[in-house]
């Protein structure tokens, strides 16, 4: 469920932002600036919370928050660059694809760890991956791609989005865009730092107790391999695979094709990821190991240093949800009371009770008309109709009927989208 939420459902909001950018507010400067600011704040805040956290699943969740910020920054560049948005368009589409595949891999891996250890705290699951080379390799595929290491899809997508910010800064001459570019690199460094934290804890520290060699069923291993394998394949074939895949979505996002080939391994493109990785290693060795870890005995213990008063969940999300619940409760109660009052007024004025009249139900009338009034025939028709209606009611209440209706609805939505796009 977490893999689907992070990898698939979070893209629903991004699709909405892309539709607004491409179709509703194309070229709108204020909309692009709003996305740029929101994306910058989101990518830094999510990555910072992930650095402080010790819970594997919470780190990955905050990482998703940060990665959505990266995608929003790419969407903002796509909007602000107008006709010159080829880098931003390709980068945003590939970033979405990379994030979905990476989080599918890492959340499935977190599920494997939890199912075998029944814990998610790094202090309790440390060393679980030691002696498991396939699990080690699958984690590295996801982590390296998310950190933007060359040879993986994440490097291609992150490079394109970063270079679109460089192009936007040069075109606009805005110090604000330059600041966002450096926040982009800094957030990339934080991404590398918290991924290194997970990697060292899972695969290099000594385990609390022996974990064994077996860690998943053949189906689990197959799912992880299928999720992780496209990351290096697309990363090693950017011109042959990654760019053509991104080009399929260009009409949807309002993007333009490349005017020239992109040299991904040129120093100008490698410089961005080199800066991010340098920042990441500095944060890991100078902050995480010195401030967020404490040596107790032979092994280091991860500490919770994030202030409780800065908890987004406790300070923002829960109060907002409680406030919305109370406001909507008052509104709905007022609407309900108003309807009751209107019904009462109507029954005492122009909708007073009339004298009872003999009334034949639609079902009885239909049976009477079908049988021309014959008593015995009416009884047989009533029994037959009752059987049909009972069968229909049982069908409507079954799970298969609900799934059939859901599939029919999805097909209708898909046809409408295809007709709209093509």
Where are these regions (language model features)?
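Hydrophobic membrane-spanning alpha-helices of multi-pass integral membrane proteins
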Residues: 12, 39, 142, 220-235, ...
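Hydrophobic cores of alpha-helical transmembrane segments in multi-pass integral membrane proteins
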Residues: 188-190, 231, 276-282, 411-418
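Loop-to-transmembrane helix boundary motifs in multi-pass membrane proteins
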Residues: 130-134, 212-229, 399-409
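Hydrophobic alpha-helical transmembrane segments
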Residues: 176-188, 261-283
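Alpha-helical transmembrane segments and their membrane-interface junctions
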Residues: 145-161, 228-249, 334, 412-420
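Transmembrane alpha-helical segments in integral membrane proteins
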Residues: 188-204, 277-297
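Aromatic-capped, Gly/Pro-kinked transmembrane alpha-helices
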Residues: 5, 241-273, 291-422
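Hydrophobic transmembrane alpha-helices and their helix-loop junctions in integral membrane proteins
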Residues: 1-216, 230, 236
């Amino acid at each position: 469920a977490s893999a689907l939420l992070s990898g698939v459902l979070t893209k629903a909001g991004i699709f909405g932002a892309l539709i607004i950018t491409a179709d509703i507010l194309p070229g709108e400067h204020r909309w692009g600036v709003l996305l740029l600011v929101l994306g910058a704040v989101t990518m830094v805040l999510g990555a910072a919370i992930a650095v402080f956290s010790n819970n594997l699943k919470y780190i990955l969740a905050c990482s998703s928050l940060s990665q959505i910020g990266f995608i929003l920054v790419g969407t903002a560049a796509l909007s602000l660059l107008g006709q010159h948005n080829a880098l931003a368009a390709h980068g945003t589409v590939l970033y979405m694809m990379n994030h979905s595949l990476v989080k599918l891999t890492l959340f499935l891996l977190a599920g494997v760890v939890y199912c075998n250890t029944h814990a998610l705290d790094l202090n309790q699951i440390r060393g679980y991956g030691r002696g498991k080379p396939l699990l080690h390799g699958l984690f590295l595929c996801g982590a390296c791609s998310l950190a933007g290491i060359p040879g993986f899809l994440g490097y291609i997508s992150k490079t394109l989005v970063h270079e679109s910010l460089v192009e936007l800064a040069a075109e606009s001459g805005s110090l604000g865009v330059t600041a966002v570019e450096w926040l982009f690199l800094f957030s990339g460094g934080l991404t590398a730092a918290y991924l290194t934290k997970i990697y060292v804890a899972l695969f290099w520290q000594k385990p609390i107790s022996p974990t064994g060699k077996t860690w998943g069923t053949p189906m689990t291993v197959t799912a992880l391999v299928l999720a992780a394998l496209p990351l290096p394949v697309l990363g090693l074939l950017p011109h042959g695979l990654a760019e053509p895949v991104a080009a399929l979505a260009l009409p949807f996002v309002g993007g333009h094709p490349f005017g020239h080939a992109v040299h991904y391994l040129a120093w100008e493109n490698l410089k961005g990821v080199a800066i991010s990785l340098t920042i990441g290693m500095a944060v890991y060795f100078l902050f995480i190991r010195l401030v967020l870890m404490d040596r107790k005995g032979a092994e280091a213990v991860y500490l919770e240093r994030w202030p409780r008063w800065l908890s987004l969940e406790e300070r923002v999300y829960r109060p907002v949800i409680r406030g919305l619940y109370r406001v909507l409760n008052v509104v709905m109660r007022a609407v309900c009371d108003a309807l009751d009052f209107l019904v009462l007024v109507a029954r005492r004025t122009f909708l007073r009770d009339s004298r009872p009249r003999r009334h034949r139900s639609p079902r009885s009338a239909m049976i009477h008309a079908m049988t021309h009034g014959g008593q015995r025939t009416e009884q047989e028709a009533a029994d037959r109709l009752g059987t049909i209606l009972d069968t229909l009611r049982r069908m409507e209440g079954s799970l298969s009927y609900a799934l059939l209706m859901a599939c029919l609805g999805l097909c209708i939505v898909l046809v409408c989208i295809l007709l709209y796009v093509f």
